[in-house]
Amino acid sequence: MKRTIKGLAILLPACALAVAACSDTATSSQSEHARETVSVVLDWTPNTNHSGVYLAMARGYYEQAGIDVEILPYSEAGSASVLLGGGADFAFEGAYSVIAGKARGDDMTMVFNLQQESSQGIAVRADNSDITRPADLDGKLFATWGAAEGVAKVQTMIRNDGGQGNVETALLGTSAYAAVYNGTADYAEGLTTWEGIEADLAGTPVKWFMPADYGVETTPAELGLVTTPAYLRDHSDLAKRFIQSTQRGYKDAISDPSGAVDALLNANPDVAIDRELATRSQELLSSQYWKDSAGSVGHGDVDRWQRYIDYLEGAGLLEDANGKPAFAGLRGADMVTNDLLE
């Protein structure tokens, strides 16, 4: 601090320095004491879906908000299970997981709706001339992640394209493009924003059928950050600081895809992430998928959530805790909120 009274500065230099030193120490101590930890469990190995968090970390946004972020690795149990079991404060999850959990009595709320438009499609070998449209999938083998919603989606696509909707399934244990090239299945579900690019780079290109093009009600949130109502109640201010810092990171990732890729790779030196794959994926996500209907990033569309819930209930795709069909009149407004966003 600059002194304006010369005599005081001459008479009390030692005292002034001592006070300043004490003040700095106290401020530092308070800052360290005030820092709070937030844990986030990933839905898969680190990839471009998570780059906004890593960019927010690299640019000090969490630190400025008094937060230390702990990234927890993907668990075979699933990120929702880790969250509900108290193993994390936030989890990367999609709308289907939140809704299906609610039907079973598991309470989760999406507080950051990362991707409103789905990039999940049905992959077929690009050189497969026997399959040129969804109707051609009838009776053929489908490699799926196992969710009933995925099978119903394909059946709807086939029927809406003039087929019968006969689907044979096999559990997808590898990437979509690998499954259709190694003969595991005739077609598989996957993400155009990652596996589609990966397939091209591997020299095994695939062609895609997108569910929305064939009358399927698609997810209102391919991915987002979820937490529990209890956490929001007990840590409302911390949750808001965390989400707004995260939102800053994803805004930066939209405007600076290369910076997002650098942050992702620098934070995960032990993870084999191909830079070209990450770069092309990030450019696609930043330019086509992350900007929301509000012109920003992170907002959830409650009306779309409700339409998707109504579709899932009407198709019998939700079960209660006893494994019986759930028709509970679930409300999207109970599962997604924009209240923590800037």
Where does each model-flagged region fall?
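Bacterial N-terminal signal peptides that target proteins for export
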Residues: 1-10
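C-terminal motif of bacterial Sec signal peptides marking the signal peptidase cleavage site
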Residues: 17-21
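Bacterial lipoprotein signal-peptidase II cleavage site
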Residues: 22-32
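Short, glycine-/small- and polar/acidic-enriched structural segments
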Residues: 30-173, 177-182, 186-190, 209
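Pocket-lining segment of extracytoplasmic ligand-binding domains
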Residues: 96-97, 175-179, 183-270
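Short, surface-exposed acidic
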Residues: 164-168, 270-282, 319-330
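Secondary-structure end/capping motifs
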Residues: 234-315
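Conserved C-terminal helix/tail region of periplasmic/extracytoplasmic solute-binding proteins
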Residues: 305-342
